[in-house]
Amino acid sequence: RLYAVCVFAPNVLRDAYPLEELESLRDCFAQQAHKVEKMIDWTRAQLDAAGLNSGEPGRVEPLSADIRTPLASAYVDLFLRADLAIQLLDALWLQGELTDAGHAERTGAMRRAPLSVLGGIQRAYARCRERIEALYRQRDAGPQ
């Protein structure tokens, strides 16, 4: 869907492509990335203030992707940064510096960040799809 919004729709709609869709998605990505970065900074500050370790990196899954658009790259980065935030929150929680409720709330927020962007992608995709379908219907109807 992200490919359809960033690559396919601009090629099909050309001048009729709604640039506000792309700007809206960029804003959504930036907002969620900012939230994740704030959580990473807050968690690192808490670990440093308490003199605690940030823990060992867990087993890393290799990531292989053919990324063709800046927003796709930003989406992958958002997942990776949210995962780092969750790892740091886990380290804080395991060392007793974060309550169970605080851990659940903060890790839940980090899990929702990429899902929030996914919702934005789905909405933009639906709007672009409607415009493309209308364009095709108009073309198929011929000149009037």
Regions found by a protein language model. Name each.
Residues R1-L78, L84-Q87, A91-W93, A104, ...:
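Polar/charged low-complexity regulatory segments
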